[in-house]
Amino acid sequence: MMQESATETISNSSMNQNGMSTLSSQLDAGSRDGRSSGDTSSEVSTVELLHLQQQQALQAARQLLLQQQTSGLKSPKSSDKQRPLQVPVSVAMMTPQVITPQQMQQILQQQVLSPQQLQALLQQQQAVMLQQQQLQEFYKKQQEQLHLQLLQQQQQQQQQQQQQQQQQQQQQQQQQQQQQQQQQQQQQQQQHPGKQAKEQQQQQQQQQQLAAQQLVFQQQLLQMQQLQQQQHLLSLQRQGLISIPPGQAALPVQSLPQAGLSPAEIQQLWKEVTGVHSMEDNGIKHGGLDLTTNNSSSTTSSNTSKASPPITHHSIVNGQSSVLSARRDSSSHEETGASHTLYGHGVCKWPGCESICEDFGQFLKHLNNEHALDDRSTAQCRVQMQVVQQLEIQLSKERERLQAMMTHLHMRPSEPKPSPKPLNLVSSVTMSKNMLETSPQSLPQTPTTPTAPVTPITQGPSVITPASVPNVGAIRRRHSDKYNIPMSSEIAPNYEFYKNADVRPPFTYATLIRQAIMESSDRQLTLNEIYSWFTRTFAYFRRNAATWKNAVRHNLSLHKCFVRVENVKGAVWTVDEVEYQKRRSQKITGSPTLVKNIPTSLGYGAALNASLQAALAESSLPLLSNPGLINNASSGLLQAVHEDLNGSLDHIDSNGNSSPGCSPQPHIHSIHVKEEPVIAEDEDCPMSLVTTANHSPELEDDREIEEEPLSEDLE
């Protein structure tokens, strides 16, 4: 019996083993089929999956029972070698399908699976379900993305097609418009074949009308210029300065060409007018002056001017004047002399231009291109003419003022003379070689450029009248406050002038500092407040370099009349009026003289003559600084001034020995002269020139203190 039971158990175990292997293989095959079916078709419903799982479980159970029944037929010999095996793990992995509770009970009763294996089976089943859900979601997302991409591609294709259609339509429309325009042009040409020719004719007529208007305007300008020239020559003839023969008359008004001149010829005529003036004015050298406006003081220009004969003007022959020949002569004179009134120091002197030109040829090109005969140039000429007229009015006022001064000083006034008309639109006056050769007593003079015309002076009694122009420039000048003339009387009427014009005020730094302190409310100012008063009151100190501040500090520290006081605000400066008035009285009671460091061989007449020359040269009046122009009246004026200051005329000859003929001229260059500018009396003339002097030997150091900082004004 024991043997039989043993054989049954062995057979059962072997059968179980064989049955389980077959079951596991079937379950694996079923799981593969299920997975493949799940992978291929994700659309199978859960109900169908459960149904398949139940069928597979039933088949597995049936096969297991059949194997157990047939296992008893096998021999038990194999049980010696084989041990009873438990259910393989593959049974748990057979399928992730849902198992019913009945099937679970049957499996537990038959002891096919242990509880642990069942738990693992359930976990795997849940994991597979999650994977299936994720796969389904992933497939859905991919389908949606593909669908969106397809829609986008379709939309892009549609847009491209629409754009292409629009472009094609636009091209067709443009082609149609071009065709229509061509057809219209052809029709117009067929209908109006001469319309274009008419338009061209109208344009030509308009151009001709403009040219005719310009010609008329230019002729008017030439007429005005010639009238001024005739008036000037008549005034000179009345004064007896020149004698005009009948054959050498000015250009008559009728000599203007009425028509038939091109703009180039008109421009040449315009240039010729200035050349005619410069050539005619060479004849005025008999009166002792050279009023040529050509800035040519070089040797080459003097040779050419000396070689060129005077130009004579004849009447018109066949409607054309002899101005063309004069133009050729003057143009050749300008080219050989390589100089021009409107050209100096490499800069174009045309008003408002100041273009840099490297050489004279480039200047001529610039002049012909930029300053051709047009509306702008003619307007600038009109402005320059107005400037000259204003300067002439100013000159007449200054002449009247000087005559009144001479009458007050018991001197013989000069005869009033009409102011000459300007010979050129550019008021630059120089000394030429022709003038130097005709007057042997004259000295060589460097060319300068004042801003006002100068009246001619004859050999008889005349008046030296330098024109006072606001923009003369910064010149070293001293105020005549030594003669008890208050500074406020000078600044008050000319306050706006000094505030806006770039003119150096004719006062010492000490006088200006005192005025600034006296104008303050508490009669004391700090250094910065003094600086502010300088820049606020005078435009000169605003627009120039601030080197004058060193001079202000220098005067504050060295003059005894300025006292430095310490207070809560800091250091302030006040004025000691007693010391200031004492300083003024010392200068007034000193021994004044006009000349310092004059050689003993020179007399007082030569000294006064030289001092006048130096003062005039410093005042930018080169024509008047010629000793040949200083006559007996001018020497008498100097004698009277010297008498008022010093009280004696013992060293001066009453017959006017201070004339140029009596004074040794080679020693003039070694003379050092102090020059004192005058106080302005009205706003029209803010500054005028009176040569006064004050030099005290005992106050030499004090004078140098005042004069040293003023040298910075010339920078």
Curated annotation (Swiss-Prot):
<dbReference type="GO" id="GO:0003677">
    <property type="term" value="F:DNA binding"/>
</dbReference>
<dbReference type="GO" id="GO:0007519">
    <property type="term" value="P:skeletal muscle tissue development"/>
</dbReference>
<dbReference type="InterPro" id="IPR036390">
    <property type="entry name" value="WH_DNA-bd_sf"/>
</dbReference>
<protein>
    <recommendedName>
        <fullName>Forkhead box protein P2</fullName>
    </recommendedName>
</protein>
<dbReference type="GO" id="GO:0001221">
    <property type="term" value="F:transcription coregulator binding"/>
</dbReference>
<dbReference type="GO" id="GO:0000785">
    <property type="term" value="C:chromatin"/>
</dbReference>
<dbReference type="GO" id="GO:0000981">
    <property type="term" value="F:DNA-binding transcription factor activity, RNA polymerase II-specific"/>
</dbReference>
<feature type="compositionally biased region" description="Acidic residues">
    <location>
        <begin position="699"/>
        <end position="715"/>
    </location>
</feature>
<dbReference type="InterPro" id="IPR036388">
    <property type="entry name" value="WH-like_DNA-bd_sf"/>
</dbReference>
<feature type="region of interest" description="Leucine-zipper">
    <location>
        <begin position="388"/>
        <end position="409"/>
    </location>
</feature>
<feature type="compositionally biased region" description="Low complexity">
    <location>
        <begin position="438"/>
        <end position="459"/>
    </location>
</feature>
<keyword id="KW-0479">Metal-binding</keyword>
<dbReference type="GO" id="GO:0021702">
    <property type="term" value="P:cerebellar Purkinje cell differentiation"/>
</dbReference>
<dbReference type="GO" id="GO:0060501">
    <property type="term" value="P:positive regulation of epithelial cell proliferation involved in lung morphogenesis"/>
</dbReference>
<dbReference type="GO" id="GO:0010467">
    <property type="term" value="P:gene expression"/>
</dbReference>
<dbReference type="GO" id="GO:0002053">
    <property type="term" value="P:positive regulation of mesenchymal cell proliferation"/>
</dbReference>
<keyword id="KW-0804">Transcription</keyword>
<dbReference type="GO" id="GO:0006357">
    <property type="term" value="P:regulation of transcription by RNA polymerase II"/>
</dbReference>
<feature type="zinc finger region" description="C2H2-type">
    <location>
        <begin position="346"/>
        <end position="371"/>
    </location>
</feature>
<dbReference type="InterPro" id="IPR030456">
    <property type="entry name" value="TF_fork_head_CS_2"/>
</dbReference>
<dbReference type="Pfam" id="PF16159">
    <property type="entry name" value="FOXP-CC"/>
</dbReference>
<comment type="function">
    <text>Transcriptional repressor that may play a role in the specification and differentiation of lung epithelium. May also play a role in developing neural, gastrointestinal and cardiovascular tissues. Can act with CTBP1 to synergistically repress transcription but CTPBP1 is not essential. Plays a role in synapse formation by regulating SRPX2 levels. Involved in neural mechanisms mediating the development of speech and language.</text>
</comment>
<keyword id="KW-0160">Chromosomal rearrangement</keyword>
<feature type="region of interest" description="CTBP1-binding">
    <location>
        <begin position="422"/>
        <end position="426"/>
    </location>
</feature>
<dbReference type="InterPro" id="IPR050998">
    <property type="entry name" value="FOXP"/>
</dbReference>
<dbReference type="GO" id="GO:0043565">
    <property type="term" value="F:sequence-specific DNA binding"/>
</dbReference>
<feature type="DNA-binding region" description="Fork-head">
    <location>
        <begin position="504"/>
        <end position="594"/>
    </location>
</feature>
<dbReference type="InterPro" id="IPR047412">
    <property type="entry name" value="FH_FOXP1_P2"/>
</dbReference>
<keyword id="KW-0539">Nucleus</keyword>
<dbReference type="GO" id="GO:0060013">
    <property type="term" value="P:righting reflex"/>
</dbReference>
<keyword id="KW-0862">Zinc</keyword>
<feature type="region of interest" description="Disordered">
    <location>
        <begin position="438"/>
        <end position="465"/>
    </location>
</feature>
<dbReference type="GO" id="GO:0045892">
    <property type="term" value="P:negative regulation of DNA-templated transcription"/>
</dbReference>
<dbReference type="GO" id="GO:0000978">
    <property type="term" value="F:RNA polymerase II cis-regulatory region sequence-specific DNA binding"/>
</dbReference>
<dbReference type="GO" id="GO:0001227">
    <property type="term" value="F:DNA-binding transcription repressor activity, RNA polymerase II-specific"/>
</dbReference>
<dbReference type="GO" id="GO:0060502">
    <property type="term" value="P:epithelial cell proliferation involved in lung morphogenesis"/>
</dbReference>
<keyword id="KW-0678">Repressor</keyword>
<dbReference type="GO" id="GO:0021758">
    <property type="term" value="P:putamen development"/>
</dbReference>
<dbReference type="GO" id="GO:0042803">
    <property type="term" value="F:protein homodimerization activity"/>
</dbReference>
<keyword id="KW-0863">Zinc-finger</keyword>
<feature type="compositionally biased region" description="Polar residues">
    <location>
        <begin position="1"/>
        <end position="28"/>
    </location>
</feature>
<dbReference type="GO" id="GO:0021987">
    <property type="term" value="P:cerebral cortex development"/>
</dbReference>
